[in-house]
């Protein structure tokens, strides 16, 4: 890829600030944009815990190295998973490690370009990549099913701020001056920008929303007798759920349910809206 030289330069800078040459556990560059640097075992465990991985989850690890994240997810948490790795020797090692751990039926590994991987089945995606790669992946990650959890080791995703960040001691970390790791969690937000229209009895309602990642703003309008009463909304999106707040209190709780927004919670003067469903206006206006 055209970004190969820039990525190699970045990693070289990181490594030379800590050790002369590659440390133990870090593999030299091959036909890949991202080097293999081992994630310490305790960091692997904390990544899975941060994503709240469980038996119903399907974990995809991008740049899976020796397979430890997918294997640990299967062994300790009962999840199924796929490791995507471009280096064939690491894929062979990962499959051998899965067999040795007794989880080969739930942990599989594939030699594949991570940018060409179908991520749609994942409920959790883990990655230890590089900043530029994270940013290149970001559009595909934002397009995933709302509620998909993403955990990145050390690197963020630019102006898409994480929902949670934790710092974990990592005395066995092979690179970096600080023997700690920062783990970032994102929950993929529903894509809700636009005009939504609904009706309850003889009254019609609309919600017009704008969105910046997991934050939203908008206006709720109640249309009565040709007049519109408006109320501003602002809040946060967690997966398919929007929480519009009034100070510290929840004013409206709205859920994206298929192709409709459904008000599942309403407080104060808006309590009559509970149960209202609204659909996105196809032509940019409510009929």
Predicted regions and their residues:
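Glycine-rich SAM-binding Motif I of class I
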Residues: 67-71
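Active-site capping/gating segments
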Residues: 156-199
């Amino acid at each position: 890829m055209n970004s190969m030289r820039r990525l190699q330069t970045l990693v070289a800078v990181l490594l030379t600030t800590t050790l002369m040459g590659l440390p133990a556990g870090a593999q030299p560059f091959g036909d890949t944009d991202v080097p293999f640097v081992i994630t310490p075992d305790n960091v692997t465990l904390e990544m899975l815990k941060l994503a709240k991985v469980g038996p119903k989850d399907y974990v995809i690890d991008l740049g899976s190295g020796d397979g430890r994240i997918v294997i640990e997810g299967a062994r300790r948490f009962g999840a199924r998973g796929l490791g995507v790795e471009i280096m064939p020797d690491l894929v062979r090692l990962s499959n051998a490690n899965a067999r040795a751990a007794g989880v080969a039926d739930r942990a599989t590994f594939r030699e594949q370009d991570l940018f060409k991987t179908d991520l749609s089945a994942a409920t959790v995606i883990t990655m230890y990549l590089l900043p530029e790669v994270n940013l290149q992946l970001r559009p595909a990650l934002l397009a995933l099913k709302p509620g998909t959890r993403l955990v990145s080791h050390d690197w963020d995703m630019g102006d898409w701020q994480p929902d949670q960040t934790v710092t974990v001691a990592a005395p066995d970390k092979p690179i970096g001056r600080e023997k700690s790791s920062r783990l970032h969690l994102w929950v993929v937000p529903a894509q809700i920008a636009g005009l939504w229209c609904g009706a309850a009895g003889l009254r019609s309602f609309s919600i017009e929303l704008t969105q910046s990642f997991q934050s939203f703003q908008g206006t709720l309008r109640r249309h009565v007798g040709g007049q519109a009463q408006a109320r501003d909304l602002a809040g946060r999106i967690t997966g398919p759920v929007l929480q519009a707040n009034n100070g510290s209190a929840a004013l409206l709780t709205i859920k994206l349910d298929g192709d409709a927004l459904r008000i599942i919670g309403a407080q104060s003067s808006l309590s009559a809206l509970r149960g209202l469903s609204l659909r996105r206006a196809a032509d940019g206006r409510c009929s």
